[in-house]
Amino acid sequence: YPVMGAGQVAPQENVSARIAQVLSAFPQVEGGYLFGSFLEREDFRDIDVALRFSEAAGSPAVLRKLASRIGRELERALSPRREVDVRILNASPVAFQHAVVKRGKSVFVPDEAGRVRYEAALLSAYLDYQETLEWFNRRFLAGIP
């Protein structure tokens, strides 16, 4: 991103603030993360947002509808308008969740203790899974069926 002058807000900070503002209207959302090309490059195509929903938020179908609605709200809230791709962390593989938490940016945290509990449990699950994942990767790279 270009160098910002005094008093200017960097694009990532502005987008992060707008995302947090929109997400605060949805009590079912327990956390929001930015991830992907928006954080890594100037020539990003869309803005990737991962959401963690409360367990009481509803069935997978309800969560998909809610995520779609939130995506539309985020697109309307951003200026200039950008395409927003929303992923549901609760329904995603552990490896994806870990990648988002590790390389992404937390932009909405209504409950810091809840975020810490989630990320600690996720790290534990990922470390348990990591050995199996590495085994699969070795077999795949070696071309073993």
Regions found by a protein language model. Name each.
Residues D48-R52:
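Short beta-strand->loop micro-motif that forms the acidic, two-metal-ion catalytic signature
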Residues Y1-G31, L39-E42, S54-P145:
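Catalytic core of pol beta-like nucleotidyltransferases
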Residues D43-I47:
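A short, glycine/Asx- and small/polar-enriched loop/turn
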